Amino acid sequence: QLTSATGPDGLEIRREYDELGRLIQETAPDGDITRYRYDNPHSDLPCATEDATGSRKTMTWSRYGQLLSFTDCSGYVTRYDHDRFGQMTAVHREEGLSQYRAYDSRGQLIAVKDTQGHETRYEYNIAGDLTAVIAPDGSRNGTQYDAWGKAICTTQGGLTRSMEYDAAGRVIRLTSENGSHTTFRYDVLDRLIQETGFDGRTQRYHHDLTGKLIRSEDEGLVTHWHYDEADRLTHRTVNGETAERWRYDERGWLTDISHISEGHRVAVYYGYDEKGRLTGERQTVHHPQTEALLWQHETRHAYNAQGLANRCIPDSLPAVEWLTYGSGYLAGMKLGDTPLVEYTRDRLHRETLRSFGRYELTTAYTPAGQLQSQHLNSLL
């Protein structure tokens, strides 16, 4: 069993198992730990998980390994029904929200119905390819296939798009809804080498022996792409002049990217913590001749104890901070010590009230979970 895996950047994933060989703990590269609990010594399926935030989720299973219920960290329960073939026939969520599924004798999904009785139907050909989706309002989207099962024609909203293939099964011609054409050419290794678009513009692509793109041509613009020994993109040139550069640290993390704009070198530098999380971005503009620094702006990022991003600190501005709960649902934001917005949510974590400044936005939903209304009110 896999107990650890270390990536090129030195970050490690670790796993622990019980005496029965079941996964009981997993440590992510950023140090976050997820624990797994089992209530049956004969089952390989966990009855509960607990993540680094302390959020606990529970599951129940049938004796055939089918998920019967899932309870999230807020106590919200989703239940599942299955038929004798193991196919899911219904999903029951909180607030009376349910979805029902029907299948044909071949086990293909043929209908999905919501709580209000709105039904979406599906049709197939004899080979089992999906040929039509009929929405509750009766609108129909269809797909036609050739003898090899490749889509040759799709119709959506009354508009049709068609595809042609070569003997190797590659798309060589695409006809859009307005009758315009795009054509494609490939090399013997199935790599795209030429594309002529709807507007008649032709783009060509060249690859090295390992499949990396090394040259592209677009209406007189010739771009060369360059890589290091780790196959990371290091720079590209356009018509012989450097256009962009990428640099990395010893862990392989991107440290900066730069390009030339109106003669000035514009760069963005990135900083990370030991867990690989982005901690800072610094943008700079340098003089074209002297390389003197003309302008810079830095933004820092911070994380809470659970590893969730919770602060953004721009230069010369108060920090922007957001408050979350559970698995990261947004509860509010503030600028410095000034509240910007607060959210109230229902049991399904849907926004029901948004308070910002002197205003409140209330949101209501139908029994089927669809947006029903929104009202903006002034508190004055």
Language-model region placement:
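Beta-strand elements of repeat-based all-beta scaffolds
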Residues: Q1-G7, L11-A28, D32-D72, Y76-R93, ...
